[in-house]
C-alpha cells in the first residue's frame, strides 16, 4: 500500500522516474552525450536565460566576477545567439568557451569571446612528448603485441557507429521521427522509412569531421557546408541504397528548401 501511494505521488510530478538505461532507447530531453543526469537547460528561451543568469549577471555588474567559462557550448540549441545575449548582459566580461576544435578548425568569427579553454593548446603540448618520426615503429610494436590490425580511421568509425547506433539510439530515433514528419509532406520524401532514416543519420554522424556546425538562416561559417557535404558523401559511399534519405538529410542540414514551401513549413524544416 505504501508503494502504491508513493507511485501515485511520483506520477503527479512533471517528470517520469525510470530505469536509467531506458534513456538509451527512449528520451525526450537533451543531455550531455549519454549522461542522463546532465540535462540541458533551455537557455534559448528568454525567460529561462534571464532566470538562470540573474545572479551571475548581478555579480558581474557588482565587479565580483570578471570572467566566465562556458562549459560545453556546443550542447546549446543556438550557441551564437546565446553568446550574443551573454555579451549584451556582460559587455566587459572575459569569456572563454569549452570547445573541441577539429584539426584545422577555427572558432566562429561571430562569437564575441576571448577564446577557448585550451584543449587545442593541450594537444600541442602533448605532441611535444611524442616523437612523430617513430610513429611507424610504435605502431608496429603495438600491432605485433595486440594482434590488432584495424586502422585508426576504421576503429574510430566503428566506435562512432556503436555509440550513435546503440548508446544514443533514443536521440537518433527522435531525429528520425522529426525528419520523417517533415519529409512525408513532399513527394521527394514520402517513401522514407524510419528504419532507413535511422541508419542514414547514424552514418552521417559517423563521418562528420567536426563536433558540430553552426547554420541558420542568418549565420553560417563558410566551412560548415563543406563539413556537411563531406559527411554525407562518405555516408553515401558506405550506404548507397539510402542515397535518397542521405540527400534529404543533406538538404535539411544545409537549409535547402523546396521552392513551394510556405514560411511555416520552412520554420519546421529549420527546427
Segments the model singles out, each with a brief description of its role:
Residues 1-67, 76-271:
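Alpha-amylase-like alpha-glycosidases and glucanotransferases acting on alpha-linked glucans and related
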Residues 73:
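Conserved Walker B
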